[in-house]
C-alpha cells in the first residue's frame, strides 16, 4: 500500500450495499406462491425455483447478441419443462420471470444507515459505484435502490470492454475521478472479482465484506482488510489514514 491518504472509495453494489440475495429469495417465494395457488403445483414449485437458481448461478451470455430478458425467461421455461415435462410453456415462464424480477427489485433498497454512511463519507472522499453484470439488469437495480445521488460516478461492467477483475475497468474508474490507483480503496463481497480486481489494478487497499465470517481459501485472493459489514468502513478508513500519518 502507498503512503498517500485515501482519496476515493469504489463500492460494489450487489450484497455489498444492497441485499440482492435476500431480494432474490423473496422473489422466488412469490413465484412459489403463484405456482401453488394459481397453477396447483405442489412440491414441484420449489423444485422449479431451485433449478432456476442454479441456472442463474451458472449464467453466461454475450450482452451484445442476447437479451437478458430472453435468457432468464428461458431459465424458467427450461426449469418448468425439466420438472413437469410436456410441451414448453413460454407464457408461464414469462409470468414467473417477471414476478420474480419485479418482486426482487421492490426489495432492493439502500438501508438508512447505509445512506447515512455514504453521505458522511462523501464529505471526505470521492465515491464510485462499480458493479459487474448486464447493463439492463444493473441499471434497473440502481434505479430501484435510488443510489445515484450518493456517488460521484457509476460504472457498470456490462457497459465496458472488460469487467472486474480486469485492471482496465479500475483504471477507467480512476480516470473518471481524477485519481491514481494508489489513492483508492475497493470495497466488495466477492474475492474473485472485487478483491482480485483491486489487487490487479494496484489499488491502495481492498476491503472484503465477509458477512458469513468464513475464512478465505489459501488459493483465494487475499484482501488487505476484512469486515463483517460495510458499516464498519468509516472506522477502517480512519485507521488506514492514521497509518499513513504515522509513516510520513
Swiss-Prot record:
Q: What keywords would UniProt list here?
A: Carbohydrate metabolism, Hydrolase, Magnesium, Metal-binding
Task: Give a GO molecular function annotation for the protein.
Answer: N-acylneuraminate-9-phosphatase activity
Q: According to its UniProt record, in which pathway does this protein act? A: Amino-sugar metabolism; N-acetylneuraminate biosynthesis
Query: Which CDD domains does the record associate with it?
Result: HAD_Neu5Ac-Pase_like (cd04305)
Enumerate the cofactors the protein uses: Mg(2+)
* Record's catalysed reaction(s): N-acetylneuraminate 9-phosphate + H2O = N-acetylneuraminate + phosphate; N-glycoloylneuraminate 9-phosphate + H2O = N-glycoloylneuraminate + phosphate
Say which enzyme class the record assigns. hydrolase
Keyword set includes Magnesium: yes
GO terms for cellular component: cytosol
The known regulators of its activity are described as: Inhibited by calcium. Inhibited by vanadate, sodium orthovanadate and phosphonate.
Q: Which residues bind Mg(2+)?
A: 12, 14, 189
Amino acids binding phosphate: 13-14, 131-132, 164
Question: Which EC numbers does the record give?
Answer: 3.1.3.29
Q: Where are the transmembrane segments?
A: none
GO process annotations (BP): CMP-N-acetylneuraminate biosynthetic process; glycosylation; N-acetylglucosamine biosynthetic process; N-acetylneuraminate biosynthetic process; N-acetylneuraminate metabolic process
Q: Which InterPro entries match?
A: HAD-like_hydrolase, HAD-like_sf, HAD-SF_hydro_IA, HAD-SF_hydro_IA_CTE7, HAD_sf
Pfam families from the UniProt entry: Hydrolase
Family of the protein in this entry: Belongs to the HAD-like hydrolase superfamily. NANP family.
Check the record and name the PANTHER family matching this protein: N-ACYLNEURAMINATE-9-PHOSPHATASE
- Job of this protein: Catalyzes the dephosphorylation of N-acylneuraminate 9-phosphate (Neu5Ac-9-P) to N-acetylneuraminic acid (Neu5Ac or sialic acid). Can also use N-glycoloylneuraminate 9-phosphate as substrate.
Which protein is depicted?
N-acylneuraminate-9-phosphatase
The organism named in the record is Rattus norvegicus (Rat)
Amino acid at each position: 500500500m502507498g503512503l498517500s491518504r485515501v482519496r476515493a472509495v469504489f463500492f460494489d453494489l450487489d450484497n455489498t450495499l444492497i441485499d440482492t440475495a435476500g431480494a432474490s429469495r423473496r422473489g422466488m417465494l412469490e413465484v412459489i406462491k403463484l405456482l401453488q395457488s394459481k397453477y396447483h403445483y405442489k412440491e414441484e414449485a420449489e423444485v422449479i425455483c431451485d433449478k432456476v437458481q442454479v441456472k442463474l448461478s451458472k449464467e453466461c451470455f454475450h450482452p451484445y447478441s442476447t437479451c437478458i430478458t430472453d435468457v432468464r425467461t428461458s431459465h424458467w421455461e427450461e426449469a418448468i419443462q425439466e420438472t413437469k415435462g410436456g410441451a414448453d410453456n413460454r407464457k408461464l415462464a414469462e409470468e414467473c420471470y417477471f414476478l420474480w424480477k419485479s418482486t426482487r427489485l421492490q426489495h432492493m433498497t439502500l438501508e438508512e444507515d447505509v445512506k447515512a454512511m455514504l453521505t458522511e463519507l462523501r464529505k471526505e472522499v470521492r465515491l464510485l459505484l462499480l458493479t459487474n453484470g448486464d447493463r439492463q439488469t444493473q441499471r434497473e437495480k440502481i434505479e430501484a435502490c435510488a443510489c445515484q445521488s450518493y456517488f460521484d460516478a457509476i460504472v457498470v461492467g456490462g457497459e465496458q470492454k472488460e469487467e472486474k477483475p480486469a485492471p482496465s475497468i479500475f483504471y477507467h474508474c480512476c480516470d473518471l475521478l481524477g485519481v491514481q490507483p494508489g489513492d483508492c480503496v475497493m470495497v466488495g463481497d466477492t474475492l474473485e472479482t472485487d478483491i482480485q480486481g483491486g489487487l490487479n489494478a494496484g489499488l491502495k487497499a481492498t476491503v472484503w465484506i465477509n458477512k458469513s465470517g468464513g475464512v478465505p481459501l489459501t488459493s483465494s485472493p487475499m484482501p488487505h482488510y476484512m469486515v463483517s459489514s460495510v458499516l464498519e468502513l468509516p472506522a477502517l478508513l480512519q485507521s488506514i489514514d492514521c497509518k499513513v500519518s504515522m509513516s510520513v
